[in-house]
A protein has these predicted regions:
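Membrane-interface transmembrane helices that cradle and orient dolichyl/undecaprenyl
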Residues: 8-11, 110-113, 152-168, 197, ...
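Transmembrane signal-anchor helices characteristic of membrane glycosylation enzymes that use polyprenol
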Residues: 17-42, 220-236
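Short hydrophobic alpha-helices at membrane interfaces in multi-pass membrane enzymes
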Residues: 19-22, 117-123, 155-176, 351-356
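Transmembrane-helix motifs of polytopic, lipid-linked glycan transferases
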Residues: 26, 92-113, 151
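Membrane-proximal lumenal/periplasmic loop motifs of glycosylation machinery
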Residues: 35-43, 56-77, 81-91, 259-266, ...
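Short acidic/glycine- and proline-prone juxtamembrane loop motifs at membrane-interface regions
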Residues: 42-43, 94, 131, 137-144, ...
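Transmembrane-lumen/periplasm boundary regions of multi-pass, lipid-linked membrane glycan transferases
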Residues: 48-53, 68, 82, 159, ...
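Specific aromatic-rich, kink-prone transmembrane helix
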Residues: 53-57, 100, 104-107, 125, ...
Length: 545
């Protein structure tokens, strides 16, 4: 009996809350960093890496809203300076920032907003979420913005809890960092501001005595960070004040103008429910638990039985003339019986539901719809999913994590072209063979309007052996220097070139709904089928027999 008790104590010690949380952190670390350069850079990643390389080698960066804010470029250029320029180094910081979401969950726990089980499950969902993992291994601005958003939330909650200026400073740094990532961050700030202003008004939070001083200090920090980075450390002041102080030439005016145009144009448009299939494809357990959590919380906020009893009391008052004070006493007793007093946890989860719903509505409305915009929606969803966590939901979540793990493995760790919407337009693994041919040649001709990511992979002096034409040219021009490789866009190519063998490769590929719309259920379980692609024709000299 004593041995059994000792064994039980050892098991409890080994599987303590802290040890399990550290294990989850290690899992998050592993799935984000392992084989980080397994796949070629995505089209957008290659552009971001190229701009960062240009910033490092030529000191050139000017704000262009098409390519978002400066934070990514400066930190990536810094990594290239320290460790060299490569696919692996380009993805290190996104992986790090994606991993650091996990410790921030622990910060929420330390403040008492979530219990131990909720902490472990929320951390596990963030650690294994296929889309969180995929876009943490991806050189885009979104994972940086998500991290800063979460850091801002933690800093705000700590500020309300302890009232210390240092937490206001952290909140300001997080805000400045997020605003230097992407142009939709002001909308997220507005969502946060409306809730917390209302919460303070209702007495859910109390502002410290020196909050006005902290607000001024924080605003100064935010403006300083943005001014320094957006002006390229003063090299492009016109981004801030405009050319000759013309309002319509400022960076923020151009950003608003550009993204309103993109919204109206719907260049990458989609229906309002665009992101729902992504939840069904990759995040089913999180999505289902979040729906249940939302219904539970909203059901608590609006209790039908309590409403009916109050209505009966009101009718009784008009019919029988019950004194007002007696009616108030009856309603008060019913209110107490229903336990409608909001706990600290309820305020937090109420915020998460509000945050999740509004951010989902915002991204559903925005005309530009792309897979990576799902991760700002997933962040609050992972917390809503752990609301009122009982053993049934816990079992469902643990089993569901097996699904998340399998999908994470499928989308992130299979070194092949995968027929998945998450990839958007991914550079094909076929390019590895194309680049082997380029590496083996002393002279290469590229006559195609579709050629990325070649400028990234042949940056610097490596580009010297490549003669580039923006579009197809005549055969004599292509062959005048006897190139070892000729690359043409297959839709604007030649059936053959004398003296050369021709082979077609995929340049980039994407999931094609139209090629799979009649077999969606079959596709869901097999994840196969026909893909859309952009192709290139590669001509190499014929080998004499």
């Amino acid at each position: 009996m004593q041995q059994a008790a000792e064994f039980s104590q050892k098991i409890k010690y080994f599987f303590s809350f802290e040890r399990i949380f550290i294990l989850i952190f290690i899992i998050a670390l592993f799935v984000r960093f392992w084989h980080l350069d397994l796949k070629l850079l995505h089209h957008d990643e290659a552009i971001h890496a190229w701009f960062s390389y240009e910033l490092l080698t030529r000191g050139v960066w000017v704000y262009d809203p098409s390519y978002h804010g400066p934070f990514l470029y400066y930190v990536t250029a810094g990594m290239f300076s320290l460790f060299g320029d490569s696919d692996l180094i380009a993805r290190l910081l996104p992986a790090l920032f994606g991993t650091l979401l996990i410790p921030l969950v622990y910060c929420i726990y330390r403040l008492g907003y979530i219990n131990k089980n909720q902490t472990l499950l929320a951390a596990l969902l963030l650690a294994l979420s296929p889309e969180m993992v995929y876009f943490s291994r991806f050189l885009r601005h979104d994972i940086f913005m998500v991290f800063f958003t979460f850091l801002l939330l933690v800093a705000i909650l700590y500020y309300f809890e302890y009232g210390q200026t240092r937490h206001a400073i952290i909140a300001a740094i997080a805000t400045g960092g997020a605003l230097c990532c992407k142009e939709e961050m002001p909308v997220i700030l507005l969502i946060f501001a409306l809730f917390f202003i209302y919460a303070v008004y209702r007495g859910k939070f109390t502002l410290p005595h020196d909050w006005k001083y902290d607000l001024i200090l924080g605003s100064f920090i935010v403006l300083t960070i943005m001014s320094v980075l957006y002006s390229a450390f003063g090299a492009h002041i016109d981004t801030l004040v405009g050319q000759n102080f013309a309002l319509n030439t400022t960076g923020w005016y151009k950003a608003i103008e550009h993204w309103i145009a993109m919204h109206n144009q719907q260049r990458l448009g989609g229906p309002l429910y665009f992101y729902i299939p992504f939840y069904v494809l990759y995040e089913v357990p999180i999505f289902i638990l979040a729906i249940i959590g939302t219904l539970q919380l909203l059901g608590k906020e609006f209790n039908p039985s309590l409403f009916i009893r109050r209505l009966k009391n009101r009718i009784q008052y008009f019919r029988s003339g019950v004194p007002t004070d007696e009616l108030a006493a009856i309603s008060l007793q019913q209110l107490k019986n229903q336990d409608t007093v909001h706990s600290k946890s309820d305020v937090f989860f109420g915020f998460c539901v509000y945050w999740m719903i509004l951010v989902m509505i915002f991204y559903a409305f925005v005309g530009e719809k792309v897979p990576w915009l799902i991760i700002p929606q997933l962040l609050p969803m992972c917390f809503v999913a752990v609301y009122k966590l009982n053993w049934q939901k816990m079992v469902f979540a643990i089993v569901g994590c097996l699904f998340l793990a399998v999908m994470t493995w499928h989308v992130a760790f299979i070194p092949a072209d995968i027929n998945e919407p998450i990839v958007q337009v991914q550079n094909s693994e076929d390019l590895r063979e194309v680049m082997r041919l380029i590496d083996a040649s002393d002279h290469v001709v590229v006559a195609s309007k579709n050629y990325w990511p070649l400028p990234w992979y042949y940056r610097g002096e490596r580009w010297n052996k490549i003669k580039f034409y923006g579009d197809i040219v005549d055969e004599p021009t292509l062959t005048q220097d006897n190139p070892g490789v000729i690359i043409l866009y297959d839709a604007a190519s030649y059936p053959s070139i004398e003296g050369y063998d021709k082979k077609t490769f995929k340049l980039g590929y994407w999931f094609s709904y139209y090629d799979n719309e009649n077999r969606l259920i079959d596709y869901y379980f097999h994840r196969d089928g026909r893909m859309g692609s952009i192709n290139i024709d590669v001509f190499t000299p014929q080998i004499a027999s």
